[in-house]
């Protein structure tokens, strides 16, 4: 077998492969012999059909099958011989083939980039620490109460946080517009569900009252036909209902499936959940900084095939998450390219760190992570048992643990600053923290 390789770009390879005619004929004959053993042809006993008849009837098909298998086999033999690491399936172009002569074809494909991860000492990480204070716990209990609020009709003027039942009709330039009208819809004042000025304009309204609201759609409104335009809404208030927060009692506690009884038992369980959330938030923020640092210190070119595969995965995830009748390939690739590029780059860099430092998933950390995840459920023992019976889930946990070990390896070499903050700041999402 003859092989030559041309580097057509940083990652693309054009490999020309020649397969000797003798090897082709051997494969063709092997298939014809297999066919002869089971072929049923009128006038001949099974297994006794002359090879000339078999060849006349089946040679073309056997040759096509043999060529396909040989191209696949010789391609992988060639990449092993040339010490190449393909990042995707090759595009195959036959150059010449005649019966009885050598086969020559060209395989064009991308390879994984070869690089060494460096720049660990240029990575700066701010590692937060925090505790769950009693005041944080009190605030969380209020959040839980508000999440379970119920509303009772009140005979008074509407205030912020009241729930109104309203009918409304909106007009732009004196014309009713699509989606601008509704009847008997519920609206909590101050929720920010409606465009600016709408909810504020209903503060002080009473049941049975009609109000005319003059508002303006935001410039970045999702409906471009309405963005930036003035509108007039005629609103009729059907009912005004005031919020009633539930009492912290056994009935309330049961909604959360907490076995402990009494307010102190409930507070203890909520605190455990908050502490678990705190640990995860701090760990996630450290990981994000490490990954950002690795990307900045190690710019690499990534194979287009990997990017396309990741874009397609993200498309499928988007359809599964948001539903609808749209097909994944109908979503524009541009929506996912930036995220896909980051994922692919990080995947390659993390894999290289694992290789450079010969990292293996730590069994003790795997057990610890499973216990941590199981502790969030009512029957943690059953959850732990389920993980250990499910090899796919176990492999996913091992992957997460290995990624954490990569983070730990980087932290040993990076510049790390510890900072004590409040619980609220520690669990605040990264984007929200940047906005502040």
Curated annotation (Swiss-Prot):
Main location: cytoplasm
Domain of life: Bacteria
All residue ranges annotated as the PPIase FKBP-type domain in the record: 161-246
A Pfam family assignment: FKBP_C
Localization of this protein: Cytoplasm
Keywords: Cell cycle, Cell division, Chaperone, Cytoplasm, Isomerase, Rotamase
GO cellular component, one term: cytoplasm
Catalytic activity, reaction form: [protein]-peptidylproline (omega=180) = [protein]-peptidylproline (omega=0)
Cross-referenced SUPFAM superfamilies: FKBP-like (SSF54534), Triger factor/SurA peptide-binding domain-like (SSF109998), Trigger factor ribosome-binding domain (SSF102735)
GO BP annotations listed: 'de novo' cotranslational protein folding; cell division; chaperone-mediated protein folding; protein transport; protein unfolding
E.C. no: 5.2.1.8
GO molecular function, one term: ribosome binding
Top-level class of the enzyme under EC nomenclature: isomerase
Residues in the signal sequence: none
Family per record: Belongs to the FKBP-type PPIase family. Tig subfamily.
Free-text function comment from the UniProt entry: Involved in protein export. Acts as a chaperone by maintaining the newly synthesized protein in an open conformation. Functions as a peptidyl-prolyl cis-trans isomerase.
Domains as described in the record: Consists of 3 domains; the N-terminus binds the ribosome, the middle domain has PPIase activity, while the C-terminus has intrinsic chaperone activity on its own.
Protein name in UniProt: Trigger factor
């Amino acid at each position: 077998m003859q092989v030559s390789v041309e580097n057509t770009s940083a990652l693309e390879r054009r490999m020309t492969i020649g397969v000797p005619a003798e090897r082709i004929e051997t494969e063709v004959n092997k298939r014809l012999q297999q066919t002869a053993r089971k072929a049923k042809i009128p006038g001949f006993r099974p297994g006794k059909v002359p090879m000339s008849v078999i060849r006349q009837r089946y040679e073309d098909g056997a040759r096509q099958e043999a060529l396909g298998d040989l191209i696949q086999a010789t391609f992988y033999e060639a990449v092993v011989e040339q010490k190449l690491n393909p990042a995707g399936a090759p595009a195959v172009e036959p150059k010449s083939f005649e019966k009885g002569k050598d086969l020559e074809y060209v395989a064009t494909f991308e390879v994984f980039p070869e690089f060494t991860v460096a720049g660990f000492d240029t990575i700066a990480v701010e590692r937060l620490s925090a505790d769950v204070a009693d005041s944080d716990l009190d605030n969380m209990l209020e959040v839980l109460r508000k999440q379970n609020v119920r509303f009772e009709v009140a005979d008074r003027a509407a205030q912020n946080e009241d729930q109104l039942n309203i009918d409304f009709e909106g007009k732009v330039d004196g014309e009713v517009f699509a989606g601008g009208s509704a009847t008997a819809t519920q609206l909590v004042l101050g929720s920010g569900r409606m465009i600016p000025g709408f909810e504020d304009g209903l503060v002080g309204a009473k049941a049975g009252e009609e109000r005319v609201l003059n508002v303006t759609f935001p410039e970045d409104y999702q409906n471009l036909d309405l963005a930036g335009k003035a509108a007039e809404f005629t609103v009729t208030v059907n009912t005004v209902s005031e919020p009633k927060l539930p009492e912290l009692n056994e009935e309330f506690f049961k909604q959360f499936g907490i076995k402990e009884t009494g307010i102190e038992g409930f507070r203890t369980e909520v605190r455990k959940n908050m502490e678990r959330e705190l640990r995860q938030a701090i760990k996630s923020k450290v990981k994000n900084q490490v990954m950002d640092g690795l990307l900045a210190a190690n710019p690499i070119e990534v194979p287009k095939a990997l990017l396309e595969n990741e874009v397609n995965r993200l498309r499928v995830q988007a359809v599964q998450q948001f539903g609808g009748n749209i097909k994944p390939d109908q979503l524009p690739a541009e929506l996912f390219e930036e995220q896909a590029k980051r994922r692919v780059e990080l995947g390659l860099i993390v894999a290289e760190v694992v290789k450079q430092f010969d990292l293996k998933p730590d069994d003790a950390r795997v057990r610890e992570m499973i216990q941590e995840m199981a502790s969030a459920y009512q029957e943690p023992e059953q959850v732990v048992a389920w993980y250990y019976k499910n090899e796919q889930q176990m492999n996913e946990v091992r992957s997460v643990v290995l990624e954490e070990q990569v983070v730990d390896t980087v932290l040993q070499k990076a510049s790390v600053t510890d900072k004590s903050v409040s619980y609220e700041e520690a669990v605040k999402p990264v984007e929200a923290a940047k906005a502040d």
